[in-house]
């Protein structure tokens, strides 16, 4: 699959840093003039100093590349390849804005930073739509909408980066359609997970988050389900993405359903909601990030995955009974296909998955948990599998290093020509790009990077080519 201009490659810096320091080596894989080179986002810790560098290579199939000739940068939380034209480094800071800038490939195959920098506000999901890189999160709405108790409603916060014009805009939350409260008609507020362009529209999973302080009090408390009032927090507590306030009902009361919002455009002003009770909500979770689980394929069909993350909830009432699975919205339709459902857990010894990525044809790469999802359990995910949506098969990937040696994967693979290229960071050696044959699910070792971490890979064309 060669990703087009509107496609997205997103790379989250979630990999563990290799515990031992390594020495930097030289480049033996120089860029060949006339080729469209690969770009690799790397990080190295040498002599107690951490350096981030964007590297180039003429192939990912073999060789060794060092950090010496890379473009040093400040690093990023997400590296977004906007097709093969621009590379954006988005920085996420918990609760705050982070600095974002973009890069291009010059005619001489060197990389350079573009002039504009942006302070992008916090986000929990990211995607592309038309000319934009688009991020969203859910946060406090405007003071003008405060209730009689002074509680603020939750609103959807949208940021739009116009990649050609190098401009950055945010939404006006005074516009009522951005309210996240009672989004699904059950009183709960939502956050969006995934931004997938389907034709001229945006498909996104609407993930119910429970009742905010505002939602608990709304309409005399009508949205608190019978028998659930004891779930309302009596004091503030928690930390990070698990923080809560006194008077809110944290996490959804409706874990056994999945909603998809279909928006007309980036304004989110007009939407259609569709629901299925075959799967739980469609989002992978890691701290405050909501991983995309909704993907359009080359055929136009849209597949919606649920890892059933709600199985980890402490209270049984908020714990889903549905296994991790996948449903489909057929090309040209805006309804779930009632005939299509695949139980992923049944094919994976009861295990679920943390991430999914579309890699071409009817194939998806899945990052599988090592054990079943349970409450209060520390989960690791060091196995990969190929899911064929048309054949409804799940094939474990072979040929990877031993699980005990893997400390993480690059957050988004690069796919072309039936092959999937994914960075693998190791505890006992340099990280490397592994090449997975999407048909056979066999992985082979490719390019080695003399660094401590690879956070992503993609391709860029020279700007005037």
For each feature predicted by the language model, list its residue ranges.
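Beta-propeller fold detector
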Residues: 62-75, 109-120, 165-185, 270-280, ...
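Beta-propeller blade signature
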Residues: 54-58, 100-104, 151-167, 217-269, ...
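Short coil/turn segments that connect the beta-strands within blades of beta-propeller domains
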Residues: 84-85, 130-131, 199-200, 299-301, ...
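Repeated scaffold domains used in trafficking and secretory/extracellular systems
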Residues: 72-84, 116-131, 180-195, 281-294, ...
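Beta-propeller domains
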Residues: 253-336, 350-351
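Intrinsically disordered, low-complexity segments enriched in Gly and acidic/Ser/Thr residues
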Residues: 337-430
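C-terminal motif of bacterial Sec signal peptides marking the signal peptidase cleavage site
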Residues: 15-19
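Acidic/polar, low-complexity intrinsically disordered N-terminal segments immediately downstream
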Residues: 20-177, 192-194, 198-207, 425, ...
């Amino acid at each position: 699959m060669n990703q087009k201009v509107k496609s997205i490659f997103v790379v989250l810096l979630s990999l563990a840093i290799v515990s031992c320091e390594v020495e930097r080596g030289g480049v033996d894989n120089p860029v060949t003039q006339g080729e469209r080179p690969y770009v690799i986002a790397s990080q190295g810790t040498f002599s107690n100093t951490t350096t981030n560098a964007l590297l180039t290579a003429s192939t990912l199939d073999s060789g060794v590349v060092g950090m010496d000739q890379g473009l040093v940068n400040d690093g990023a939380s997400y590296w977004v390849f906007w097709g093969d034209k621009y590379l954006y480094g988005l920085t996420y800071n918990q609760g705050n804005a982070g600095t974002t800038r973009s890069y291009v490939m010059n005619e001489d195959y060197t990389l350079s930073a573009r002039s504009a920098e942006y302070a992008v506000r916090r986000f929990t999901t990211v995607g592309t739509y038309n000319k934009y890189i688009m991020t969203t999160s859910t946060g406090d709405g405007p003071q003008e909408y405060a209730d009689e108790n002074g509680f603020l409603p939750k609103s959807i916060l949208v940021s739009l980066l116009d990649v050609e014009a190098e401009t950055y805009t945010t939404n006006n939350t005074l516009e009522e359609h951005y309210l996240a409260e009672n989004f699904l008609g059950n009183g709960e507020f939502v956050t969006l997970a995934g931004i997938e362009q389907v034709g001229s529209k945006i498909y996104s999973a609407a993930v119910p988050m429970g009742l905010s302080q505002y939602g608990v009090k709304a309409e005399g408390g009508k949205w608190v389900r019978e028998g659930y009032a004891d779930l309302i927090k009596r004091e503030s507590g928690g930390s990070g993405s698990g923080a809560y306030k006194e008077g809110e009902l944290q996490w959804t009361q409706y874990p056994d359903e999945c909603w998809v919002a279909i928006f007309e455009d980036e304004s989110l002003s007009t939407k259609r909601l569709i629901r299925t009770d075959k799967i739980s909500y469609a989002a992978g979770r890691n701290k405050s990030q909501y991983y995309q689980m909704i993907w359009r394929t080359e055929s136009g069909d849209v597949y919606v995955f649920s890892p059933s993350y709600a199985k980890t909830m402490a209270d049984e009432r908020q714990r889903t009974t549905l296994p991790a699975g996948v449903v489909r919205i057929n090309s040209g339709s805006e309804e779930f296909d009632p005939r299509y459902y695949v139980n992923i857990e049944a094919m994976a010894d009861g295990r679920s998955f943390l991430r999914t990525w579309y890699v071409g044809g009817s194939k998806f790469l899945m990052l599988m948990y090592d054990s079943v999802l349970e409450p209060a359990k520390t989960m690791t995910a060091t196995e990969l599998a190929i899911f064929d949506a048309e054949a409804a098969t799940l094939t474990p990937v072979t040929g990877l290093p031993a699980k005990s040696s893997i400390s993480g994967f690059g957050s988004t693979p690069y796919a072309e020509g039936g092959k999937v290229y994914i960075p693998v960071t190791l505890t006992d050696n340099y990280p490397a790009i592994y090449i997975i044959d999407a048909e056979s699910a066999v992985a082979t070792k490719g390019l080695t990077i003399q660094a401590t971490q690879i956070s992503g890979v993609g391709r860029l064309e020279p700007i005037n080519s």
